[in-house]
Amino acid sequence: MVEESRYEDSGAPVINPSTLLARVIVRQIVEAGITDVVISPGSRNAPLSIAFHQASVKGLIKLHVRIDERTAAFFALGIAKASGRPVPIVCTSGTAVANYHPAVLEASHTNLPLLVLTADRPASLRKTGAN
């Protein structure tokens, strides 16, 4: 999101680096011809979730939101099987990623294309017990 209270010398809004990176990732995914994405929303993957939502509003990608990561991953696997196209699954950090594991194994053994995008906590919070 744009931080409206801070501006560069040019008067243009300063964009958070995570937001900028998320927009680049989404643009590359859309340009690769990927048509669907499945998101399990969380605080750490908010920039990706927002960028995918913005692409969805513009009609560039079909957004599917599933709160439960296991459900999300298997739902994406079904889309990949039906379409033959890669399907990104997006989640936050920590144990959320582990919940994708069964579907990722299934995708690997059946040669179905899943693209796993996960967010991580800031470096300053790694190995501190912050969850």
Language-model features and meaning:
Residues 2-131:
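N-terminal alpha/beta PP-like core and its mobile active-site loop of ThDP/TPP-dependent enzymes
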